[in-house]
Amino acid sequence: MKKIKLFSIVAAFVAAFAFTSCNTGDDNNYTKPLTQAEKQTCYLKTSGSRMSKLAYISDEHVTEYVTTDKVKQKEYIDTLDVATDIYGNGKDTVMTVNNFPVKIFARYIEGDDKKELKEALKKCEMQVSFKSVVTYYTLTPVLQFFLTPEAITVNLEYGGATHKVKFYCYANQPYPYYSIYNAGLVDNTTSKLEAYFALYGYEVDPKDEKNPKPTAFRYKIAEKPYTGAQIKFFEP
């Protein structure tokens, strides 16, 4: 297990990190759109198969550390190897996760009526793929981009039947609330790429996939209640 410093979990999700605005100077404080040349520069700095690690919250893997003011803390984070890529097809730039381990979501499902689902998910060795549209947002002072992920889908056998289970991320709301849940950046210090996703919850055998009605992840870690889950992909 490797300690990841730039990773946090909160009960009520806000932005995975604070986005820096490139303002036009007017009173409306709007962000200046990137030019096509700037978007191409962003693409060149992020494309390829760079992020090969996944970090996620897990109380099965605890690291103790001491803060700068000499206070002992515990960090509930584990890491796994994954395969990701960012490529453009002439229309959209897309981030693809090729072997996502859905079993990690079992930790975020609790309740007596969810035991069969939880156990089936814990035993699931299937790795699934999912895609996210990349929208480049700023080039300077920090290269940042929004991510619009599709639902993560897996078929699970439990209770004598096959069930389709879909996992949903929170939706970004750039305007007017400026709540950014799924996004990425290039670290200015290391020039390494990282991306964050905030998961809301799941739906079993959805009746209307165009209008999902997911159940929120609700669980406790170190006796503290949490809603939702955050995962991070990063370049080692």
What are these regions (language model features)?
Residues 27-34, 167-236:
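Edge beta-strand at a domain terminus
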